[in-house]
Every structure is written in structure tokens, then in C-alpha cells.
């Protein structure tokens, strides 16, 4: 899946944005989230999270930002892999970040109770 962010901005523009994030927020990770299969939409797709955040904490932040129904399950995919909630995002960032400095995440919502 091609990221909307990559389609909208050139590699150089994205690199500049990630560098600005690193300069402004030391020890943080720039993430771009593509939302698919969502009943609600959000304007916020760029996130800056602390190095120690887990995937579970990122899911909680997304859920709070979008005020999702508790019956909705969220799944995060990085490079077409479902990532366990206990995984520290900085570990994934080191192996899966893009050339532009962002970690691209696909977030999918599924209604689990009907």
C-alpha cells in the first residue's frame, strides 16, 4: 500500500520534515499512520512518540485521538506485518524506518462484536 504522505510530498520534503522533528523533539520517533477501514476519520496522521513507547501505547493514543467505540479492534501493520502490542516502537523503527526518516504504519479498524 502506498502512503498518502509519500504521494503528497517528495522524498526531500519528507526528509526535511523528519529532520525538523528530530531537532525539535529529541529522543522521539516520527510516525506516519495510514488509516484503512475506519468508521471515523482523523486529520491527524503524523505522530511523534517517545522512544520507549510500545505498540500498545501507540494503539491507546490512536484510540483516544479518534474516540473509537470499545467494540472496535485496532490492528497496526508495519511492512505488511502485524506487530505485537508489547513491541517497543524504537526497535521496529531501527529496522523498518523509511529513507525519509519516518516509520510508516497502516492502522486498520475491525468491528469485533457485530
Residues of each region from the PLM?
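Ubiquitin system architectures
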Residues: 1-114
Amino acid at each position: 500500500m502506498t502512503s498518502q504522505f509519500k504521494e503528497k510530498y517528495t522524498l526531500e520534503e519528507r526528509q526535511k520534515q523528519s529532520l525538523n522533528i528530530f531537532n525539535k523533539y529529541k529522543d522521539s520517533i516520527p510516525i506516519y499512520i495510514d488509516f484503512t477501514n475506519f468508521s471515523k476519520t482523523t486529520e491527524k496522521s503524523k505522530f511523534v512518540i517517545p522512544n520507549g513507547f510500545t505498540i500498545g501505547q501507540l494503539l491507546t493514543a490512536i484510540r483516544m485521538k479518534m474516540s473509537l467505540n470499545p467494540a472496535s479492534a485496532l490492528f497496526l501493520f508495519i511492512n505488511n506485518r502485524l506487530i505485537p502490542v508489547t513491541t517497543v516502537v524504537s526497535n521496529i523503527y531501527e529496522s523498518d524506518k523509511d529513507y525519509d526518516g519516518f516509520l510508516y504504519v497502516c492502522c486498520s479498524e475491525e468491528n469485533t462484536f457485530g
